[in-house]
Amino acid sequence: MSAPISIVIPTLESARTLPVTLLSLIEGVDEGLICEVVVSDGGSKDATQSIAEAWGAEVVEGPSSRGGQLRRGVALSRGVWVLILHSDTVLQAGWALEVQQWMDRGPQCFSLAFNASGIAARLVAAWANLRTDLLCLPYGDQGLLLRRIDYDEAGGYPDQPLMEDVALVWALSPRVRRMQSHAFTGAEKYQQQGWMRRGVRNLILLARYSAGVKPEDLARAYLPSDPPN
């Protein structure tokens, strides 16, 4: 059987973090899971695209809207399954074995962890994992593994600058389940803005989006000082 999973990674000025993300995928190649890596770039001026190409990834470029980038990346991919990862996410060693065991159970995400120590990092990650278990609402930094047919039936990622991960998860018919393997994500924004402040900001953002505020209006309020990875 051919390798079933396409990896899709949205990038923007990701030269510093992308190599470690790609390195964590090697075990998936060794296990015969990954057929390709697609990097959907939003117009990086650093070495992001050349790094991706050096690692053998397919690169597609377009406007820097994460929803649009993901939509283009998935459209270019060919795997029966798609695994969406952020460019600052590193998968825990052993992830490929768990993915093999869970692939027949529908959409999956990883357990969130931060590449930082301290109680604040653990509490924020614990809340994210609890939210996933109770509300079936993971965020994009936990990764998302799903069958292409489920992705297509949900309408795919909307071309919007943020909350594209929430929009897709809400549209999925099979509920997303959380695996035990961790996705370690960057903590720089939390460390710069403060763990509490950043966490409250994310809750307000979700609440406003849930109340019907347009993603473009949210982006004007939040993204000028907080560009996506």
Map each language-model feature to its residues.
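A short, conserved alpha-helix in the catalytic core of glycosyltransferases
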Residues: 150-154, 160-178, 182
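Cell-envelope/extracellular polymer assembly enzymes that use nucleotide-activated donors
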Residues: 4-6, 36, 167
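Short aromatic/hydrophobic "clamp" motif used to bind/position activated sugar donors
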Residues: 82
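A conserved acidic beta->alpha catalytic loop
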Residues: 41-49, 89
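Conserved donor NDP-sugar-binding/catalytic core segment of glycosyltransferases
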Residues: 93-120
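Short, well-formed alpha-helical segments that are part of the catalytic scaffolds
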Residues: 13-29
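Short beta-strand/loop segment that forms part of the nucleotide-sugar
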Residues: 23-26, 33-43, 62
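Hydrophobic helical membrane-anchoring modules
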Residues: 1, 170-229
